[in-house]
Amino acid sequence: MDRVSTTLDQQHAAPTGSAAGRAERAARARATAARLSAEGVDGVVLGWVDNSGITRVKTVPVRGLEHAAAWGVGAAPCFDVFLVDDSITTSRWIGGPAGDLRLIPDLDRLVRLAAQPGWAWAPADRYAQDGSPHPGCQRQFARRSVAAAERRGLTLRAGIEVEWVVALAGPPEEPPVYPTRGPAYGMDRVTDLSDYLRDLLRAFDQQGLAVLQLHPEYAPGQFEVSLAAEGPVAAADTTVLVRHTIRAVSARHGLRVSYAPAVEPGSVGNGGHLHLSLWRGERNLGQDGVGPYGLAGEAESFLAGVLAELPALLALGAPGVASYLRLVPQHWAGAYQCWGPENREAALRLIPGPSGEGPGAANAEIKCFDGAANPYLAVGAVIAAGLAGLDARLGLPAEVTGDPAARPSGEVPRLPGSLEQAVAAYQGSEVLRAALGDPLFEAVLAVRRAEIELFAGHTPQEVAAATRWRY
């Protein structure tokens, strides 16, 4: 296994400008760099995900890892207000050409990239020049949410399903040409792309990623990989790494990849379903309780808080104009603000798990999130919403079984059907503003408004074409 550390979700003290802090980080990085160099690694990618859902990077030679860990690598604050097309907006707190931040690699999550010989990758946290946490750092926001749960004696385990469409390589303006036309979920797709899928499994394994399933999905050329649950920040890191890996393996096979919510309008899109379970000690609060389907009271209140905030959460979990080409009824996208046991049309699907499988089986799935989401924003905001529900001792409404679209109109509330509607809910969410803090909250708001304006008047086909190869 190539990951330097298998730590799931460690909490890190914020690095400071102290000589002792820099020396400690430098010593760890020096040892890590020596090991990487001996393994043939020449460069290290430091990555973070911006508010439009795009992974941005800086790279350093392996000999520069020590300096990067001690002092950071410069990056402009304006990355917080980049749009999906690389244009830049501004917000009340963040934007403009002035200022600089430091990217500090998380050495506990550094991994040698199996599909990119000579390269390693590490997620980066962003700090101000004085060593204080950057208020717009999405990864540190997720960590703060985890810490807020831990102060209540609670821990969470999470996993994000990664769905993607694979197509033959070609110019970015061209629509996808699929390398397999086999049936949805069909063995033909595995046969047609056998070597490709095998190389993916090998790369995941070499990087220490615990794959649960890899299988064809519904849309043309679509596949899904799901991984074992881990701490929420680690799960977000894993999602970024998995996407990198899929893209790298695909390129080696003459293929290109889209994680976009809508690759082709009218077809099933790429989801980013978030699975969460809430724990107190060794007890999974999603089972063996006295609430609905075995939920403990704390788990019910947590999920009720998530359900109540889902319209606002969509601005983070379904963040693009294209997201609402995917989020439609009767596509298993979770377009209704309801919950139900094993209901794939509900935005919040309760998964009790097979009887007798063990305490790790029960979890909840948020189905309305998609592949455009920044995973750190998604997990951090969902935790914040759940904790607000727990603090308010909310209860779940009546469950919904079957297809909500088959109910009388208005009986089951629809989630926002456009980014404009989601942004309106987000703007009014006191829970999310308090959790994210004004600088991050406002930066997200600025990006969403700017992308709404960017795609104003575009047809669904034009929106899909403009975003298809951006994610």
Question: Model-predicted segments: where are they?
Answer:
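Core alpha/beta catalytic barrel or barrel-like domain that forms the active/cofactor pocket
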Residues: 157-168, 175-177, 184, 207-227, ...
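Short secondary-structure transition/capping segments
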Residues: 56-57, 169-170, 224-226, 270-272, ...
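Long hydrophobic alpha-helices with heptad-repeat/coiled-coil character
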Residues: 212-232, 238-248, 316, 454-471
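Glycine-rich tight-turn/loop motif centered on a GG-T
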Residues: 178-190, 228-236, 285, 290-292
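Active-site capping/gating regions of soluble enzymes
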Residues: 19-22, 26-35, 42-43, 47-150, ...
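Intrinsic-disorder/low-complexity, polar/charged segments
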Residues: 226, 231-232, 324, 342, ...
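ATP/Mg2+-dependent ligation/transfer catalytic cores
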Residues: 2-213, 411-471
